[in-house]
Amino acid sequence: MKRFDPRSLWRPVVWICRFRHRRGYGVHSPFAFQLITRVFYERGEFYAYRPLAVVRRTEACGQSERLDRLMLRLVNDVQPRRVVLWGDAVGVTRRYVEAGCRRARIDEVGCGALPAAKGYDMLYARRPADGLALFEAFAAQAPDRAVAVFEGIHRSRRRAAEWKAVCSHPRATVTFDLYDLGIVFLHPKLNSQHYLVNF
């Protein structure tokens, strides 16, 4: 039986406030529009959804199936070579990342510091205590076209302030605020833009 989460009562209010930011309306960048329509809002049945649903029933899950499926689609679109998973209880999310890109090397670092000079293409951070410091450590060693994903960016005022600081970082060019997740692209050739998405 699922535990009741009081934040679920707030979810309809958030959805109504973000209603005009759905499905890519008003987005003019081809890169951002493609990502919103073909990754965030993809409704097709991916090849790995059914086997991963079986795994999900047997293992402890850290986040919702909806967010894990989004991670699979994002990894499938980005195709990173090296991924680092930061935080506790990322086991099921790791399976989704592996299914999205089988050739990616995946490291789990728990809640410790990121290994220096590893050249990670993608960072997934589950509710980091200091998101800005973690992003700065990632951005210092990340190659161009890297991606950082932060979970729980609106869980508290402190995390929301950290998310704003991450968005204003010089290497963060395109950011997406999906309320539950924050996605940062480090693409130097793209114009700096911050998108609010009703996901």
Residue ranges and their predicted role:
Residues M1-D144, H154-F199:
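A short alpha-helical cap/connector motif
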